[in-house]
Curated annotation (Swiss-Prot):
Pfam families: Cation_ATPase, Cation_ATPase_C, Cation_ATPase_N, E1-E2_ATPase, Hydrolase. Belongs to the cation transport ATPase (P-type) (TC 3.A.3) family. Type IIA subfamily. It catalyses: Ca(2+)(in) + ATP + H2O = Ca(2+)(out) + ADP + phosphate + H(+). Gene3D superfamilies: Calcium-transporting ATPase, cytoplasmic domain N (3.40.1110.10), Calcium-transporting ATPase, cytoplasmic transduction domain A (2.70.150.10), Calcium-transporting ATPase, transmembrane domain (1.20.1110.10), HAD superfamily/HAD-like (3.40.50.1000). This is Calcium-transporting ATPase, endoplasmic reticulum-type. It comes from Solanum lycopersicum (Tomato). It comes from the Eukaryota.
Length: 1048
């Protein structure tokens, strides 16, 4: 039974200790731990049971098209078994058709199982986020390196800098003046959060507001503390996320393409069933006859052999109608799409996501690390000038921790005045951070804010010309890196050597500042302070001017500084004040812990008095900046009809400022109906929520928890939107899993986010999504092209068999030949159509609707027209060979075969009753076709006519592939060389067809013979008109579209 959560954040520390029946100085007893472990279990995430292999295999066959193929294979197998004595075939030759179909299905199943078995790793990645060990108080003794999975609620745990939090815990006491925890991957907050022991006044508050709680998977970056474990295992926030990921995976729906293909498969099944039944039924007279006596049928005669024969024709029709190669061609096209996207830094983990991107209607984006760099940087800073009536502002370029990324605008480090030099000194020395290089990415060690200040110092430079040259040279050569990772910050090092740091006044929540005492080159001590602007300004009595002189901080100057700071804050900048103090009283001569005044530094309550009467130096504005390319990507999405919604865990003002900066909103736009916190949005009724999400324009949801993100994505999907969700944190994982396509960041993204996603951005570049959407749209268009090509070919095959059955002539195509055409000769051109170039205006069209049919009425009409010509030409050449001496000026009887009347060909089944019917042997390549019985002329003797039919079918389909280069544009506008791969594929298909014609044992398997040059000429003459027919249809289609546009 799941325990009701205890709101430890809203209770005092004493009340929490009483609730968990534990003493802070002793911890739990071994006996109590055993009781609680039995009640709460181990502190680990549940391992979801994976699907067994047999279930994965079965799921691969749960597809309409696959089921049709299975049915065709089964019937073909039965018929081959029943008829093998009659046909004289045995072994492999008799079962070629069902074995080939089964081979295709098994191959597809193997690929599907391999993909799926490698897909579900998100929950394992979550486990890696949990701390492996902890320092725990048990039975009055502090146990270091205690296994984290053994923790139970009520345990007393000590945390220090660098520790990974092993469970959700209530902060009981601070062992340092301040405690900060990095929890951006869990909550989306861009800055480390300062924690305290104070209780909150409400039970119902956001995750980010629980400042007296530390959560499993987060990391302590500053300070140390003692905590009480309140939640373990699946009851932690990470555990809740795991459950949400699992629930989201259960809600995964089919991709738009799969829905369309399943719909197409269902219609195809019905059509095949009807046509097969009709073909079989219209030939009933050949296997069922009766006498009519007194107006009533009697004396029924039934021929099982003939019934089976025409049933086999119906099966051949099914084989012809099923595009067996379509699943593999779609898979190949999607795989090619993944390669193209990988070249653009979009790594696709699930093939279907390639096409899903193309119909995306909404992108739900995280802010931190997705729209922004997740790297704090100084955007601008200001100080007073020569007078207290004016400020001077300096803009700073660059958005990363790379010291060489940008510089200070209009800056000359050789002319830095005393005020700017002191600002550089404070930023360099009142600082515990560093920068390291991980591959090509620069990252911060310590607090991101402090790392950004150090990068600013590197951009400011140093006043010493010799040192400046030495630093510049070091940055050029490999010594820029101290080792493989750590970045050498030469300017900061210069300041730290110049002014030795002798004491530190740690940051705390009361005074909101940090101070350091340094020994200046002249031997005197100076206090350097940085902190919250309002707090430092309040404690300052003087202000420094540009020349280094100080003047009293009067009210007018104070208002000037406040006004300038307000202007910076409105841009979404976090403002840090900088100050100093020379008159340190008894600390003026401080040098080490042995100094008499050292006891004052041990008492944090004295820090406020030490940091009073300060001299205000200036203000630094920092931000987590938007990526440079995001603004353009947002505009591209807007033109493409894609809505953008920003869903972030950060605070409302920061989120709105970033959205304005990337021009999701204009600067003067009222955000009353466009910006909400997660809690505010969830408080609305369902109808109000739908109205908000339905409105045009961007939306921003701040302070969003994982459940909020998941609920927004779910609602959008229920509204019929195709949702792409981007993110990089653990908090994004459930929504990434639930979205139609989850997109994770490859560099800054957590493993949890990556494993829950469908696609990973290798460069963390938001604009890569736009490129991927364009590629997805292009792939869909190309898919329509090869589906149109393959289906029109299949329609032609169906019509040819239908005509054969209606006319009563011998079958001109057998199932194994149809399989060869559908799988092999059609495959290369269909695959090559996946390389068709994208339309120029592909990102200026709105996304296609979910309701848009894959095959509309006009496309169906074109299928039927082209298919009819394919069928007529295929059957026509078969009839011509039997009945005509020449055709289109080409002599057909040069091989010596016997001509028959069309009526004889249509009634070939009655051949045994004909009198004086004789046939002559004829040549087929080097082979002489002879007959022991004249009636064999319509079975054994049809090999040449059947070869011509098959060759016409192949040739027409090759020419038809040229028609598929563009849905509406003529070959004059879209010439074949625009896609050279198609020309290569056509050559390959012709080569493969030639192989089965001219390799004897393959010719025997497929029941065909070699053709002469004149016969090939006849094939080409009958096949080429398909291009002219489709050109006429394209012309009509263009006229129809223009008429519709004019009417609109």
């Amino acid at each position: 039974m799941e325990e009701k959560p205890f709101p430890a954040w809203s209770w005092s520390v004493d009340q929490c200790l009483k609730e968990y029946q534990v003493k802070l100085e002793k911890g739990l007893s071994t006996y109590e731990v055993d009781k609680r472990r039995e009640r709460y279990g181990l502190n680990e995430l549940e391992k979801e049971k994976g699907k067994p292999l047999w279930r994965l295999v079965l799921e691969q066959f749960d597809d309409t098209l696959v089921k049709i193929l299975l049915g065709a294979a089964f019937i073909s197998f039965v018929l081959a078994y029943v008829n093998q004595d009659e046909t004289g075939e045995s072994g492999f030759e008799a079962y070629v058709e069902p074995l080939v179909i089964l081979w295709i299905l098994v191959l597809n199943a193997i690929v599907g199982v391999w993909q799926e078995s490698n897909a579900e790793k998100a929950l394992e990645a979550l486990k890696e986020m949990q701390g492996e060990s902890a320092k725990v108080l048990r039975d009055g003794y502090l146990v270091p390196d205690f296994p984290a999975k053994e923790l139970v609620p009520g345990d007393i745990v000590e945390l220090r800098v660098g520790d990974k939090v092993p469970a959700d815990m209530r902060v009981a006491t601070l062992k340092s003046s301040t405690l900060r925890v990095e929890q951006s991957s869990l909550t989306g907050e861009s800055m480390p959060v300062t924690k305290s022991t104070d209780f909150l006044a409400t039970d119902d508050c956001e995750l980010q507001a629980k400042e007296n709680m530390v959560f499993a998977g987060t990391t302590v970056v500053n300070g140390s503390c003692i905590c009480i474990v309140v939640n373990t295992g699946m009851c932690t926030e990470i555990g809740k996320i795991q459950r949400q990921i699992h629930d989201a995976s259960m809600e995964e729906s089919d991709t738009p393409l799969k829905k369309k293909l399943d719909e197409f498969g269902n219609r195809l099944t019905f059509a095949i069933g009807v046509v097969c039944l009709v073909v079989w039924a219209i030939n009933y007279k050949y296997f069922l006859s009766w006498e009519v006596v007194d107006d009533w049928p009697s004396d029924f005669r039934f021929s099982f052999e003939k019934c089976a024969y025409y049933f086999k024709i119906a099966v051949a029709l099914a084989v012809a109608a099923i595009p067996e190669g379509l699943p593999s061609v779609i898979t190949t096209c999607l795989a090619l799409g993944t390669r193209k996207m990988a070249q653009k830094n979009a790594i696709v983990r699930k093939l279907q996501s390639v096409e899903t991107l193309g119909c995306t209607t909404v992108i739900c984006s995280d802010k931190t690390g997705t729209l922004t760099t997740n790297q704090m940087s100084v955007s601008e800073f200001f100080t007073l000038g020569r007078k207290t009536t004016a400020c001077r502002v300096f803009g700073v370029e660059g958005t990363t921790y790379d010291p060489k990324d940008g510089g200070i605008m209009n800056w000359n480090c050789c002319k830095m005045d005393a005020n700017l030099l002191l600002m550089a000194e404070i930023c360099a020395i009142c600082n515990d951070a560093g920068v390291f290089c991980d591959g090509r990415l620069f990252k911060a060690t310590g607090l991101p804010t402090e790392a950004a200040l150090k990068v600013l110092v590197e951009k400011m430079g140093v006043p010493d010309s010799k040192a400046r040259c030495k630093i510049r040279d070091a940055q050029i050569v490999s010594s820029y890196l101290i080792d493989r990772n750590t970045v050498k910050l030469g300017c900061c090092d210069w300041w730290m050597k110049r002014s030795k740091r002798v004491a530190t006044l740690e940051f705390d929540r009361v005074r909101k500042s940090m101070g350091v005492i340094v020994r200046e080159p002249n031997g005197s001590n100076r206090l350097l302070v940085k902190g919250a602007f309002e707090s430092l300004l309040e404690r300052s009595t003087y202000v420094q001017l540009a020349d280094g002189s100080t003047v009293p901080l009067d009210e007018s100057c104070r208002q000037l500084l406040l006004l300038k700071q307000l202007e910076m804050s409105s841009k979404g900048l976090r403002c840090l004040g900088l100050a100093y103090k020379d008159d340190l009283g008894e600390l003026s001569g401080y040098y080490a812990a042995t100094h008499p005044a050292h006891k004052k530094l041990l008492d944090p309550s004295c820090y406020s008095s030490i940091e009073s009467d300060l001299v205000f130096v200036g203000v630094v504005g920092l931000r987590d900046p938007p990526r440079e390319e995001v603004h353009r990507a947002v505009n591209d999405c807007r033109r493409a009809g894609i809505k953008i919604m920003v869903i972030t865990g950060d605070n409302k003002s920061t989120a709105e400022a970033v959205c304005r900066e990337i021009q999701l909103f204009s600067n003067g736009e009222n955000l009353r109906g466009s910006s909400f916190t997660g809690k505010e949005f969830m408080a609305f009724s369902s109808q109000q929520q739908i109205e908000i999400l339905s409105q045009d324009g961007g939306k921003v949801f701040s302070r969003a928890e994982p459940r909020h993100k998941q609920e927004i994505v779910r609602m959008l999907k229920e509204m019929g939107e195709i949702v792409a969700m981007t993110g990089d944190g653990v908090n994004d994982a459930p929504a990434l899993k639930l979205a139609d396509i989850g997109i994770a960041m490859g560099i800054t993204g957590t493993e949890v986010a990556k494993e829950a996603s469908d696609m990973v951005l290798a460069d963390d570049n938001f604009s890569t999504i736009v490129s991927a959407v364009a590629e997805g749209r292009s792939i869909y268009n190309n898919m329509k092209a090869f589906i149109r090509y393959m289906i029109s070919s299949n329609v032609g095959e169906v019509i040819s068999i239908f005509l054969t059955a209606v006319l009563g002539i011998p079958e001109c195509l057998i199932p194994v030949q149809l399989l060869w055409v559908n799988l092999v000769t059609d495959g290369p051109p269909a695959t090559a159509l996946g390389f068709n170039p994208a339309d120029v205006d592909i990102m200026q069209k709105p996304p296609r609707k979910n309701t848009d049919a894959l095959i509309n009425s006009w496309v169906f009409f074109r299928y039927m027209v082209i298919g009819s010509y394919v069928g007529i030409a295929t059957v026509g050449i078969f009839i011509v060979w039997y009945t005509q001496a020449s055709f289109l000026g080409i002599n057909i009887v040069s091989d010596g075969h016997t001509l028959v009347e069309l009526s004889q060909l249509r009634n070939w089944g009655e051949c045994s009753t004909w009198t004086n019917f004789t046939v002559s042997p004829f040549k087929a390549g080097n082979r002489l076709i002879t007959f022991s019985d004249p009636c064999e002329y319509f079975t054994v003797g049809k090999v040449k006519a059947m070869t011509l039919s098959l060759s016409v079918l192949v040739a027409i389909e090759m020419f038809n592939s040229l028609n598929a280069l563009s849905e509406d544009n003529s070959l004059i506008k879209m010439p074949p060389w625009r896609n050279p791969w198609l020309l290569v594929a056509m050559s390959l298909s012709f080569a493969l067809h030639s192989v089965i014609l001219y390799v004897p044992f393959l010719a025997d398997i497929f029941g065909i013979v070699p053709l002469s040059l004149y016969e090939w000429l006849l094939v080409i003459l009958l096949s080429a008109p398909v291009i002219l027919i489709d050109e006429v249809l394209k012309f009509v289609g263009r006229r129809r579209r223009r008429t519709k546009l004019k009417a609109a």
